[in-house]
């Protein structure tokens, strides 16, 4: 029984390679973001501290200027880029680069809170970035792995191969990823401000 379950969830070799490449790109971007955040010191570090303190003060007062559509677009734009790149040969290089950038901005933003507030910064960093990442990270990888494999096939095509038609599986996967990304945007709009407000009160009062 265990062997059957294991075989069912085992990925083909090409998918495992694609997953490893994208994971490495995302991790490399994340490590770079953390290192860059840790290097902020002197006047730059002071300005960063003032900025994040002011940001938490706005969060505590519930006056952060955030609209629904910009948040939804912020969550969807990376996914749309991955889906689009997967339809061209450029995706073979473009998708890993995009994963690296996404990992960099994610970790840099979170690490800045820890750089300024120490351990206390973990709480607002998780509420602001980590909570939605539980949704958009799976969506990104779910679109990225088949996307990079599709881009590889596009690279091998010849001019006389004809037009590629998108399969029903592609549309189902795209809809699932879009649902996760949009849910992350709604979570960031309705839930995150409440949790961030509570975290800001704890940090600024201590």
Predicted regions and their residues:
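Conserved mixed alpha/beta catalytic, RNA-binding, or beta-rich assembly cores of soluble enzyme
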Residues: 95-118
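Perimembrane loop-to-helix junctions flanking transmembrane segments
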Residues: 45-66, 204
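Interfacial helix-start motif at the membrane-water boundary
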Residues: 57-84
């Amino acid at each position: 029984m265990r062997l059957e379950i294991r075989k069912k969830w085992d990925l083909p070799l090409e998918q495992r390679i694609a997953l490893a490449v994208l994971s490495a790109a995302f991790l490399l971007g994340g490590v770079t973001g953390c290192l860059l955040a840790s290097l902020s010191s002197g006047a730059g570090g002071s300005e960063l501290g003032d900025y994040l303190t002011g940001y938490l003060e706005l969060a505590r007062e519930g006056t952060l200027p955030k609209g629904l559509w910009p948040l939804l677009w912020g969550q969807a734009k990376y996914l749309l880029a991955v889906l689009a790149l997967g339809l061209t040969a450029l995706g073979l290089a473009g998708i890993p680069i995009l994963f690296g950038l996404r990992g960099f901005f994610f970790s840099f933003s979170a690490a800045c809170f820890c750089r300024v507030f120490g351990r206390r910064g973990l709480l607002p960093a998780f509420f602001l970035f980590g909570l939605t990442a539980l949704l958009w990270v799976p969506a990104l990888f779910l679109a990225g792995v088949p996307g990079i494999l599709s881009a590889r096939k596009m690279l091998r095509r010849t001019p006389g191969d004809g037009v590629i038609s998108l399969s029903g599986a592609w549309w189902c996967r795209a809809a699932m990823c879009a649902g996760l990304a949009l849910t992350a945007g709604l979570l960031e709009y309705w839930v995150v401000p409440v949790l961030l407000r509570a975290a800001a009160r704890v940090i600024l009062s201590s």
